[in-house]
């Protein structure tokens, strides 16, 4: 007993801290409320925090009890020491109970809540907390018995929950095959959330094995000594270490609770019914455990059975992890059951350490090669270097057709202006018309030197080159335009003069409408150019007057001779002999005029004509009338008539 007390005093001195210093870690532990299940973990933490807080408060009261003048207060030092000794005795007893319960307690995810809250958060008052703290103040043997029952109940509850989650998982895997179950029984749970919860529960085997070892050592010590107080404190750990372990376990349990809440919200159909049933069972079991803690058993051997149960739970965890890994592979092989990670809600807790490890057998699983993917070199060697079935590699290289290069595209031609395009269209149309005309006409080979194809060359050049005397737009076969024939003059002089005056008075009409001069792009011309007066040029005309200058008149002239000529001829004797008394020439007798007679007639005619002309001139001067002169010129001499007249006169 004395040795144990010495060890407890040493541990107390290690735990104790200087007066006036507050331990915020213990204050944080004190602020953690107890779980509704009434487990001893929350009560242990609150008891330790209350003891430390009372100790610090007493120290502060002792220091502050001095008067403001610096004199000590009237409180005796003995009273303070007695109060401290009483508190230390209670603290030692509570510490022993806490140490033993922390070693014997199994892993229970209903034991604590999230410890990551802020320091300023106020603790929630719970009536169960006071009850558990009172229970912990009892002797150590009763506390061990009560804690053993609590851990046993928590272990059974954990086993039920694990079995329920595995059942849900199996149902979801079966529901992935639509041929086995109807569509009404399909599971819409978040499979990844359920599996991650199992992984987190089984992700700390080291902590569980350490607790089992501590329980074994405690069991062996109790069996050897027969009293809990005589158990050696070799395996005693610092309370802060135990608190850290509890924080870690509480973090995992809070993560598991969040996963279960996500499953409850996302599940539907049979999964919702199973989860509701499971939740009701857990609540009833927790309430029964809280009621049984008030009635502590009196058997000490339950501690050994608790260790054996923890071993069985550890073995069950390992089996479930194996089943979980197999189920994870099956789910990943079925792409229909895969759930997108982006759609799953973000979790505040950390992911397990082995979440990113590759699965076993994933290296052997390879997707089948597609048609467009290149074939590996090993496969090519096995197939004899034939990437295409039925043809060797060398034949493909030799027979591969070479793709000719595409010629460069010609640049698009520039668009001509409207005037140029109109001129080209007119020229083309004119050439077509000329070609059609030349085809109709057949060229004679005898008359022309050119024949056959050579003639077509000249015909095609007709519309391009102009010949002398051709107007623009004419072809060689066309006749040039002529002036209209002049109007015939009327018989009377007055009518001709009136028509000439009308033509001279008429002015030539303008060729076309005169357009207003415009500047570039329809702009107005400047003022000094637009205001210039236009000069109209008169068309010059040539007036022609026709006058009679001379004329020819043909008429008969009466014969005039001298008296000698006018004498009648004598009768010619029948014999025809000329007598000497009437000497006449033979010409007279024969009716032929003599030269002297002809000269006489000519002279008389000339004289008579000259007289007539003089008379005509005098008449014109008197009448003042412009008349052409008339000349009578004998064109021939009628000898026969003159002879006949002479005969008649004779």
Curated annotation (Swiss-Prot):
InterPro entries from the UniProt entry: Aim21
One family name in Pfam for this protein: Aim21
Keyword Cytoplasm: yes
Chain intervals with Basic and acidic residues compositional bias: 198-217, 320-335, 368-379, 562-573
Main location: cytoplasm
Disulfide topology: none
Low complexity: compositionally biased ranges: 488-507
Keywords: Cytoplasm, Cytoskeleton
Positions with biased composition (Acidic residues): 640-650
Residue ranges with Basic residues bias: 407-417, 515-526
Residue segments, region Disordered: 1-148, 197-529, 559-650
Keyword presence, Chloroplast: no
Localisation per UniProt entry: Cytoplasm, Cytoskeleton, Actin patch
Compositionally biased spans, kind Polar residues: 1-10, 31-51, 63-74, 85-96, 242-254, 264-274, 282-296, 444-462, 578-588
Any one GO CC term of the record: actin cortical patch
UniProt superkingdom: Eukaryota
Cited function: Involved in mitochondrial migration along actin filaments.
Family: Belongs to the AIM21 family.
Full protein name: Altered inheritance of mitochondria protein 21
Organism of provenance: Lachancea thermotolerans (strain ATCC 56472 / CBS 6340 / NRRL Y-8284)
């Amino acid at each position: 007993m004395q040795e144990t007390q010495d060890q407890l005093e040493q541990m107390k001195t290690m735990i104790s801290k200087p007066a006036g210093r507050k331990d915020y870690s213990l204050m944080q532990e004190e602020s953690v409320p107890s779980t509704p299940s009434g487990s001893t973990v929350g009560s242990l933490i609150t008891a330790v925090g209350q003891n430390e807080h009372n100790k610090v408060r007493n120290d502060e009261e002792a220091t502050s009890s001095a008067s403001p003048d610096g004199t000590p207060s009237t409180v005796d030092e003995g009273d303070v020491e007695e109060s401290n000794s009483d508190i230390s005795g209670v603290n030692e007893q509570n510490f022993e109970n806490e140490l033993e319960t922390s070693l014997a307690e199994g892993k229970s995810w209903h034991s604590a809540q999230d410890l990551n809250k802020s320091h300023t958060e106020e603790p929630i008052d719970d009536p169960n907390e006071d009850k558990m703290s009172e229970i912990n103040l009892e002797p150590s043997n009763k506390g061990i018995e009560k804690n053993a029952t609590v851990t046993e109940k928590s272990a059974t509850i954990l086993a039920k929950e694990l079995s329920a989650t595995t059942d849900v998982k199996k149902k979801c895997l079966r529901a992935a095959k639509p041929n086995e179950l109807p569509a009404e029984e399909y599971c819409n749970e978040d499979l990844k959330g359920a599996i991650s919860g199992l992984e987190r529960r089984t992700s700390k085997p080291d902590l569980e094995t350490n607790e089992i070892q501590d329980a074994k050592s405690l069991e062996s010590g109790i069996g050897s000594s027969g009293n809990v107080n005589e158990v050696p404190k070799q395996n005693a750990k610092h309370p802060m270490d135990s608190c850290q372990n509890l924080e870690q376990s509480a973090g995992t349990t809070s993560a598991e609770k969040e996963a279960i809440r996500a499953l409850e919200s996302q599940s539907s159909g049979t999964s919702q019914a199973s989860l509701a049933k499971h939740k009701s069972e857990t609540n009833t079991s927790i309430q029964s455990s809280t009621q049984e803690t008030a009635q502590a058993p009196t058997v000490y051997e339950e501690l050994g059975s608790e260790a054996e149960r923890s071993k069985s739970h550890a073995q069950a965890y390992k089996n479930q992890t194996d089943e979980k890994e197999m189920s994870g592979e099956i789910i990943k092989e079925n792409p229909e059951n895969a759930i997108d990670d982006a759609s799953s809600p973000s979790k505040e807790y950390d992911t397990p350490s082995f979440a990113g490890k590759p699965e076993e057998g994933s290296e052997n699983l390879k997707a089948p090669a597609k048609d467009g993917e290149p074939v590996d070199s090993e496969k090519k060697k096995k197939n004899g270097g034939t990437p295409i079935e039925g043809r060797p590699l060398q034949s493909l290289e030799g027979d591969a057709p070479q793709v000719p290069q595409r010629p460069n595209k010609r640049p698009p031609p520039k668009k001509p202006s409207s005037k140029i395009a109109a001129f080209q269209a007119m020229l083309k149309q004119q050439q077509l018309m000329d070609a059609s005309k030349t085809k109709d006409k057949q060229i004679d080979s005898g008359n022309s030197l050119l024949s056959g194809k050579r003639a077509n060359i000249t015909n095609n050049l007709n519309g391009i080159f102009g010949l002398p005397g051709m107007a623009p737009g004419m072809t060689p076969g066309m006749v040039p335009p002529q002036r209209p024939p002049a109007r015939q003059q009327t018989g009377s002089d007055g009518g001709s003069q009136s028509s000439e005056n009308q033509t001279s008075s008429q002015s030539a009409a303008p060729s076309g409408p005169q357009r207003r001069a415009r500047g570039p792009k329809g702009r107005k011309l400047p003022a000094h150019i637009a205001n210039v007066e236009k000069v109209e040029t008169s068309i010059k005309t040539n007036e022609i007057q026709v006058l009679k200058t001379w004329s020819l008149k043909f008429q008969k002239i009466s014969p005039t001779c001298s008296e000698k000529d006018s004498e009648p001829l004598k009768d010619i004797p029948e014999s025809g002999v000329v007598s000497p008394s009437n000497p006449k020439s033979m010409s007279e007798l024969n009716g032929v005029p003599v030269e002297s007679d002809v000269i006489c007639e000519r002279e008389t005619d000339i004289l008579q004509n000259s007289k007539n002309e003089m008379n005509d001139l005098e008449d014109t001067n008197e009448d003042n009338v412009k008349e052409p002169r008339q000349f009578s010129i004998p064109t021939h001499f009628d000898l026969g008539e003159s002879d006949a007249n002479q005969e008649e006169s004779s």
